[in-house]
Amino acid sequence: MSSDKLHKVVHEAHDVEARHAPEHFYNSQPGKSYCTDEEHYREMYTQSIEDPAGFFGPLAKEYLDWDRPFTQVQSGSLEHGDIAWFLNGELNASYNCVDRHAFANPDKPALIYEADDESENKVITFGELLRQVSEVAGVLQSWGVKKGDTVAVYLPMIPAAVVAMLAVARLGAIHSVIFAGFSAGSLKERVVDAGCKVVITCDEGKRGGKTVHTKKIVDEGLAGVDSVSKILVFQRTGTQGIPMKPARDFWWHEECVKQRGYLPPVPVNSEDPLFLLYTSGSTGSPKGVVHSTAGYLLGSALTTRFVFDIHPEDVLFTAGDVGWITGHTYALYGPLTLGTATIIFESTPAYPDYGRYWRIIERHRATHFYVAPTALRLIKRVGEEEIAKYDTSSLRVLGSVGEPISPDLWEWYHEKVGKNNCVICDTMWQTESGSHLIAPLAGAVPTKPGSATVPFFGINACIIDPVSGEELKGNDVEGVLAVKSPWPSMARSVWNNHARYFETYLKPYPGYYFTGDGAGRDHDGYYWIRGRVDDVVNVSGHRLSTAEIEAALAEHEGVSEAAVVGITDELTGQAVIAFVSLKDGYLSENAVEGDSTHISPDNLRRELILQVRGEIGPFAAPKTVVVVNDLPKTRSGKIMRRVLRKVASKEADQLGDLSTLANADVVPSIISAVENQFFSQQKK
């Protein structure tokens, strides 16, 4: 670290230059930008903070259709946890996403389905979507589903999942989407907690060329669950012999043909729940985050429009599943509220080859691509050469979601995928926020590699000192990220447990919403997200961002991915333990001196520790580096550092809730690696 940066708190901000939107972005726009420049953003943002009623009230009337107008824009406070928006108004989410667009332009594409098998791709228009949603809503209504009831949706990323969600919302009921990769036990836990009367699923799923026995998992999970009276089964594969329990299980296609092609939507109150979405905590059972109808819809629409500069003619490719908040907000509710076509992607970036993403973009002339850094790292590692084979010139905006994107991956994304012609939108938000908290407005706000940039409208972001609890004013400060006033799309509660909601988000810093993330605000007022606060390590009084150490490790030519955790240390308070997965074939027990493509385990650890010392300083050097085959990741692509911390702290018997792990099978090998590479060395 150079001496002129030592006194800077957010020192990495001085390593990058602000980037303005390239000419291609403006030349390829189908219309004028919704936010024209940085000054326009500042004006709108200031109004949204100083006069939220005057800002969001007119926008709610402009972007949403109401059955009954609201009489008050906002009430309640973070201190009391009684937030409400657009009071006394009535509307329906399904109508706002489907009907009004179908009436205006029934032949306009709504859902572009990219199936696991590309020969099964199809396009569903708004007119067709309205008919399908009405039919499924009719089935549910005939089963007694009504306003306020909860319905579980356990489907893969196929159009039927979108149809099911909108059908539930059409009746004023509450959908609880459960990711179709969850186990039977995890499914049961969520269905029972939500009190679901009906489950919507399918016979089987297809992903990466493999068959997923979806209905079988549902049957196992619901064994003995008497509260579920009906199961609607979509025929995805048509496999014969799928067990169907009489009087409980019914085929989607057989029931839908009995229904009318149009079912009027049921108006609900602005604050009535639209959906539950379960998110896993570090301890205890998963919590069902509750999102309201009007506030969530408006937040999803506004962020989709202004952050991504989405126009009605655009095509949005969000490579996320509706089992997670990214799929809810930016594959469904955001684009459909705006009447924009959205790509529903069932498969993986590697099936049938690593050209899949780029074929999708070329085939459908996608203008926006929104993906997690995990997928980008995978492609960078093994499939980069596929990008150049396809015409991706339709792209205008590239988004990143799920975790902070490192500056080097940001640059790769910009150059290799965007051909230096696209705006990069690094977005920071979470299940509980409903929509973007920190993100650039494409074309209006200059970007910085590694920074999520600036707060969205209504997000009164601040940095709090985690020790004193005081807000840190000014720029070049670092602490925990919080928000000090309510915004429309924020979660309202945890299902059946408002006390847990209050304890988790509103009590840690009274008067503020606590995001749980560490962050820095640089000299320009841009935000740099550090990751979860429990991913900050304090070594000998030095507060170290694990993201910074991980970035230093990732610069090594042999490292594919890195994760860093802190464990208790008698001498330094905490010690840094690094976990790395390597590029294929890089490590060799028999490597010889001078071999530039292979290295022995001991030499690799030595190099990595020296790399961190050189990049950050001796105080940041890991106590040890553990080489693993893969890192534990949630199904949304985030590394579950809690697992690594527990294992490294000799608490492998206290791992907590692992239901969101996509690769739980790697945990035993990680435990073994820590034992062999760390604990055994301590004994010597």
From Swiss-Prot:
It catalyses: acetate + ATP + CoA = acetyl-CoA + AMP + diphosphate. SUPFAM superfamilies: Acetyl-CoA synthetase-like. GO terms for molecular function: acetate-CoA ligase activity; AMP binding; ATP binding. It holds the Pfam family ACAS_N. Its EC number is 6.2.1.1. GO terms for cellular component: cytosol. ATP binds at G402, E403, P404, D426, T427, M428, W429, Q430, T431, D517, R532, R543. InterPro entries: Ac_CoA_lig, ACAS_N, AMP-bd_C, AMP-bd_C_sf, AMP-binding_CS, AMP-dep_synth/lig_dom, ANL_N_sf. NCBIfam families: Ac_CoA_lig_AcsA, PRK00174.1. This is Acetyl-coenzyme A synthetase 2. The lineage of its organism: Eukaryota, Fungi, Dikarya, Ascomycota, Saccharomycotina.
